[in-house]
Design a protein with these regions (language model features):
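An edge-strand/N-cap motif at the start of beta-rich repeat modules
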Residues: 21-77, 172, 178-195, 202-238, ...
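Short glycine/acidic-enriched loop and turn motifs that connect beta-strands
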Residues: 66, 111-113, 210, 249-253, ...
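Sec-dependent N-terminal signal peptides
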Residues: 4-14
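Blade-level signature of beta-propeller repeat domains, shared across WD40, Kelch, NHL, RCC1
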Residues: 484-518
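Short coil-to-beta transitions that initiate beta-strands within beta-rich domains
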Residues: 32-54, 82-99, 126-198, 225-239, ...
């Protein structure tokens, strides 16, 4: 705390404005520079628009989430193909697999793309869209001659009226010819889009429940949700093997809070109005500890008790200054809550929201929270504040700099270095030269920041901004590199991966790979 205070004092003495503020963008061929696994996006893929079978995979085209892939022989879901993989659009209209040339084609509103399996990248097709894969004509002829058509030939595409009576598990009810009733009595539909594989399985499309699998041996229907809910992601929280994803609803169903149980590869959705205790599922922030996961929403703080499997919501009735939550930070046994009208905290495990007796921040929007061993640093609409929990004291950092005094969007601490980013630029303290440095020409809208060895990362409205501290070098990653969207809201560091909550989906960027640099 004393070191940071001293650094702020030095800032008042003199601010060094760095001259090196040129931001580099992609200048190389992305398909020779990146591998297909360097950028992977998980977007809403509940509405299936096309189904095709290749040599090793069954492919599901989707309305918003690119192409889902299931390995037919090893029985696992591989990462999806999206614009991060080179597709020109995540809206897939049709799929076709050319078995002779081993090429997968995808028709999108922007044209027909083809996947090169040898070099593992997508490119515009030169000769248009070939017809979908079909059975041998003799197999179809033989099938239609049979009185008891119990087995479809491989690659056959049956209509709904050709399907047998189907059985489902306890969670769903199937009502012929195409209605699927979910556990909350919502009606979805089985589409007349599907293809049979070599193992007597029929892979089909639904209009909101993701891929469907019909085992034609016992006539059982299995629903297989394989994506985030229908949201614009705003936050990602890595909870051991579980991955929690929240955001704002895009108006489609299902929506809500998403849990990806990575060890079992199961996706679940938790929606307000359907799950008791969840008042709102438009999520802006997520944090947690070993027992609880907290979700900042547009209508208070939602808490999930993993031990009891219970949900509850905290609102102004529990003394929140505002129900519009901007950020959450678990520090020790407390949850600190940045709201649109100040800061609150909650003693984890209890139900009473606390607020400071120091009212300097009341009615001031708090955007982000950072902390060291004793102080909280708060990015607000009116500059930088700090809060001392021991003294219950709030103070404003009057730096005298335009960089710090208006609309700060992100704040961070890394190895005794204090960083701020706002409408008027970025500033940090340089320990080597014992002075503050600012980058006032970088005028982005900042939402978040994160740190990895040698790099500082900024979530902005123009992409993912990287600063190489050692080289004094800036690089801006955009959709041309592999982002799902240039609107990046949150950065979560996972070793050599960055989990990025963007408007177009959650993009996982492998920021470090030996031999790769931008």
């Amino acid at each position: 705390m004393q070191k940071i205070s001293f650094l702020l004092f030095l800032f008042l003495i003199g601010l060094s404005n760095s001259k090196a503020q040129v931001i580099q963008k992609i200048y190389f061929d992305r398909f020779t520079h990146y591998t297909i696994e360097d950028w992977v996006t998980y977007a809403p893929a509940t509405d299936i628009t096309a189904v095709e079978i290749g040599d090793d995979y069954v492919y599901f085209g989707t309305r918003l989430g690119g192409i889902l892939r299931y390995h037919l022989y090893d029985d696992y879901w591989d990462f999806p193909f999206t614009t991060s993989s080179g597709l020109r659009s995540n809206h897939i209209l049709a799929l076709s697999y050319d078995a002779d040339n081993r090429q997968l084609y995808a028709k999108t509103p922007k044209g027909v793309d083809v996947y090169n399996f040898a070099f593992q990248y997508w490119q515009p097709a030169q000769n248009g869209m070939p017809p979908p894969r079909q059975p041998d004509p003799e197999e179809i002829k033989y099938y239609r001659q049979q009185k008891n058509r119990a087995r479809f030939p491989a690659y056959y595409r049956p209509s709904l009226r050709e399907l047998p009576d189907l059985f489902t598990d306890r969670a769903y009810l199937f009502r012929p010819p195409d209605e699927i009733i979910d556990p909350y009595n919502r009606i979805f539909h089985l589409k007349s889009i599907g293809v049979v594989d070599k193992f007597n399985r029929l892979w089909m499309a639904t209009d909101g429940l993701g891929p469907a699998l019909i085992n034609l041996t016992d006539n059982t229907l299995h629903l297989m949700p394989r994506s985030i809910a229908n949201i614009f992601p705003k936050a990602v929280y890595l909870d051991d093997s579980d991955i929690w994803i929240g955001g704002l609803s895009n108006g489609l169903t299902p929506s809500g809070i998403c849990l990806w149980q990575n060890d079992t590869d199961i996706w679940k959705y938790y929606e307000a109005g359907l799950i008791m205790g969840i008042a709102n599922h438009d999520v802006t922030a997520i944090d947690g500890d070993r027992r609880f996961v907290f979700f900042g929403t547009e209508l208070g703080v939602v808490r999930y008790d993993k031990k009891k499997d219970e949900w509850s919501t905290f609102t102004r009735a529990q003394r929140l200054l505002s129900e519009q939550i901007n950020d959450l930070r678990v520090i020790g046994n407390k949850l600190y809550i940045a709201t649109e009208r100040g800061i609150n905290w909650l003693d984890i495990g209890f139900k009473n929201i606390q607020r400071s007796k120091d009212t300097k921040l009341n009615s001031i929007p708090v955007r982000k929270i950072a902390f060291d061993d004793s102080l909280l640093y708060l990015a607000t609409a009116y500059g930088i504040y700090r809060y001392d929990p021991r003294l219950d004291k709030i103070s404003v950092l009057k730096t005298g700099s335009a960089v710090f005094d208006v609309n700060i969007g992100a704040v961070g601490l890394h190895r005794d270095t204090l960083w701020f980013a706002g409408d008027n630029g970025i500033a940090f303290y340089d320990p080597a030269h014992k002075q503050w440095r600012s980058f006032t020409q970088i005028r982005f809208r900042f939402h978040d920041m994160a740190f990895t060895p040698h790099f500082v990362w900024f979530a902005t409205d123009r992409g993912l901004l990287k600063y190489d501290v050692n080289e004094n070098y800036w690089y801006l990653y955009t959709t041309n590199d592999g982002l799902a969207s240039n609107h990046v809201y949150r950065i979560t560091v996972d070793d050599t991966d960055l989990w990025l909550a963007t408007k177009g989906g959650v993009t996982v960027f492998r920021w470090y790979r030996p031999g790769k640099s931008e």
